[in-house]
Design a protein with these regions (language model features):
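Short, proline-enriched alpha-helix->beta-strand connector loops that line the catalytic pocket
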Residues: 64-70
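Short glycine-enriched nucleophile-adjacent loop
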Residues: 22-33
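Gly/Ser-rich "nucleophile elbow"/oxyanion-hole loop immediately N-terminal to the catalytic nucleophile
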Residues: 1-19
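Flexible "cap/lid" loop of the alpha/beta hydrolase fold
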Residues: 45-62
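Catalytic nucleophile serine of serine hydrolases
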Residues: 19-20, 43
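Residue in the alpha/beta-hydrolase core beta-strand immediately N-terminal to the catalytic nucleophile
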Residues: 14, 38-40
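C-terminal catalytic histidine-bearing segment of alpha/beta-hydrolase fold enzymes
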Residues: 73, 82-130
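Active-site nucleophile loop of the alpha/beta-hydrolase fold
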Residues: 40-48, 76-78
Length: 130
């Protein structure tokens, strides 16, 4: 639908989601990674359904055909000093994936909602590097 009305460069696409949208972003990352080159999951609800997304990740061996970037962020307050954080656990399970660059941002003093804006800022920085 968007492609019908706007020019889309299919080699430069980013999927962004926050909270449950961040969980959706991780789902697409795991199951349809060829559709986007960049994935930004801000404060993803990894805990949902008894950490189902982590279980799904552990069952897969992911290697990427093209260079792919995954950006994960979480607010310090919402993380409740959990060590490692859910996003760090997610990233650790991907450490041996080929053609994948992972960035993690722990946002100091930020709650779940407050963590949204610094993550959006990263999307704009990512897009401006092109």
């Amino acid at each position: 639908m968007i492609e019908e009305n706007y020019h889309i460069n299919k080699q430069k696409q980013t999927l962004f989601g926050h909270s449950y949208g961040g969980l959706f972003t991780l789902y697409v990352f795991l199951n349809h990674s060829e559709d986007f080159q960049n994935f930004v999951a801000a404060s993803p609800s990894i805990w949902w359904n008894d950490y189902y997304i982590l279980k799904e990740l552990k069952e897969k061996k992911l290697d990427f055909k093209i260079n792919t970037k995954l950006f994960l962020s979480v607010g310090e307050v919402e993380n409740k000093n959990k060590v490692p954080s859910d996003i760090e656990t997610f990233a650790t399970n991907l450490r041996n994936s080929k053609n994948l660059e992972i960035s993690i941002l722990n946002i100091s003093g930020a709650s779940h909602i407050e963590a949204l804006y610094p993550a959006l800022n990263q999307v704009f920085k990512l897009e401006n590097k092109r």
